[in-house]
Structures are given as C-alpha cells and as structure tokens.
Amino acid sequence: MPLLTVNNLKVERGGISVLEIPLFSLNEGETLAILGPNGAGKTTFLLTLARLLGYIQGKLFFKGEDISLPERTVPYRRRLAMVFQEPLLLNTTVFNNVAAGLKIRRMKKKEIEKRISKYAELVNIRHLLNRDARKLSGGEAQRTNLARAFATEPELILLDEPFANLDAPSCDSLIDDLYRILRQTETTAILATHNRLEALRLADRLAVMDAGKIVQMGASNEVMNYPVNEVVASFVGMEAVFSGCVQTVCGGSFVASVAGHAIMALGDVKAGEKVICCIRPENIIISRDSAMEGTSVRNNLPAKIVKIIPRGPFFKIDLDCGFFLASYVTQQSLENLSLMEGKDVTVSFKATAVHVIRREKRC
C-alpha cells in the first residue's frame, strides 16, 4: 500500500486552476523529487499535501486513511514535517528551536533531550546547541531547521527548496548529509526543487511539473534520459531540442532530415513522420576536423561556435549547425582545440545519443 495517495486533486486561486493532479502516489521509504520552473506549482502541491492549503476537489489518503476529512487534519499534520526555503527559526537557542516540535507534542524532558542529542548529531549541529539562532550562518540555520523537522520523527517530510539560499559548499555538504539521514532513518520524503542535480543526488524517483500539472513521473534515470515532451527535455538538461522529418527507416534505426542534414537515430518511427530529437551536451563531441569519421559515431556535422560560456570547471559551447547544439568541454580541451567564438568545427554524436519524441504527424 502506498504511504500517500492523491485522487483528482484540484486547487484554484481567484477562480483560476493552479493545480490539477488526477492521480499521485508515494511509496513508503522513498524520496521523490519534484522538478519544475518557478510558478510550476511545486510549493502549492506541497502545501496542499501538508493540508496547509485548501482545495476545491479531490481526495488525499495517508496509509489508506482519508485525510480529506476536517477532523483528521490535525492528527495527520502531526505525522509529517515541512521544511521551507527560509528556516523560520525562533528567537532563542538552537536547542530550543530543535525542541519546539517536541514540546508541542508534550514529550517528557528526558525524551526531548534524547531526541535532540540524536538528531543534532545526525545533522552535525551538536556544537551549536547553545548558540543564539540569530547568529547562525545560512547553512547552520537550515541544518537547525532540518534537525527540528527530523526530531519529531515524521512519517513524511516535505522539503520546499531547502538549499536555494545556500552557498555552493554549504549546499553540497547539506545535500550529502540529507541523503545519509534519509537513508539511515528510512524517512519518506518529497523534495521540491528547480535544480536537477539536487534532485538526482537525493531522489529515487522524479516528477516534472509544468503549469500546475505533473507531466512526467518515474525512475530518475527514466525521466532524465527519456523525456515525454520538449518541456521535460529542456528541464532535465537536454539543451538541444530540434524537429526533423523521418526520411528512411531500417530496422530500429532511421535517418531524419534536420535543417538539410541527415541525422541517424534509433526509434520506432515511420517514414514521413515528424519527430523531436533531443541530445544532451555531454554527448556532443567537438573536433577540428572529421576525426570521428570511420568510427561508430554516425553523425558528423559542420558547425560554427556561436558562444563560449564558463560553467564552473567546464565551458558550455553553443553551436550553429543550421539548428542549435550545445556541448561541454574542459579548460584543457578548449585550449588544445583552440576553440573560440566564430570558429568552424565538426560536431559528432552517436545515433544512440539521440532521444526521439514522436509527434505522430506527417511532414
């Protein structure tokens, strides 16, 4: 039995639908990441699941129990915890902040101290327990927020962009610790984020939201590599998304015409059919000549470098092949290939690197 199930959920604001979830289920012990741009409905969905936001239609079930009924709202809320982007700490010590939820539950002093000791250790804030919460760094404050949530030992924890305001080192460290804590405590979690790297590091499954709807949900690898439409493809990192017309089909492979180029890919398509092709930047190889010809790489195209953009330890290379492509290279590759804006190069990618979305329309 799923831990949480949603049926025909609908939320409106000012008479306008902002959230429509026909069917949703969450398994006990799993971590689900909800990806989507700002305004996609991620926070609205979490607030609705927490019963902190009303809805005009639908049913929510927690362990098979209908929690849509008003009299079950408070008991249900006590079984979950929610962590927001802002820590919202009380004007007191870290110890008292972590103890807040336990005191509301009227736990005994010894049990409170035991819980705080356990979760302060897990979240690495034991040395901060006597500190004034107002003097914490952003990372320390969010760790305190997480300790407060986990100390109640919730059956479900909802995480709404918890890393959004942190610097990169604090974010990386906290994500690693959160992954460890979720696995160690076997707590079921839903993470709302617009950062696909955070989602991949933490989640067993991914859901992608757009305009208040879940447009795709599945195993992380499935969603990342097999998006169902252009919106999902762009959001999960397939920066090159372009349309083509299938010319010839042979077995499980085909050749599509794209801006005058013949692109080989794999897929169950028909000649004359329109398709959307998606390629990840890491699957695009740049060379100064046709060096990849004669290898297993089937697609070799002339291209011009349009823009070079620093991306941490890598550089993103925007390319014009008559259609847009992008690639990532290291500093060493950038120098070895003498890459610069305006330079003509050859781009290569395997037929297996192309993810195909069928349009089921004729060219």
Predicted regions and their residues:
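Helix-to-loop junction immediately C-terminal to a conserved catalytic motif
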Residues: 50
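Glycine/charge-rich catalytic "coupling/switch" loops of P-loop NTPases
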Residues: 260-308, 328-363
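Conserved ABC ATPase signature
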Residues: 132-136, 140
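Conserved ABC ATPase "signature" region
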Residues: 110-128, 179-180
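ABC ATPase NBD coupling module
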Residues: 66-81, 104, 227
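The feature captures the beta-strand-to-loop junction immediately N-terminal to the Walker
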Residues: 35-37
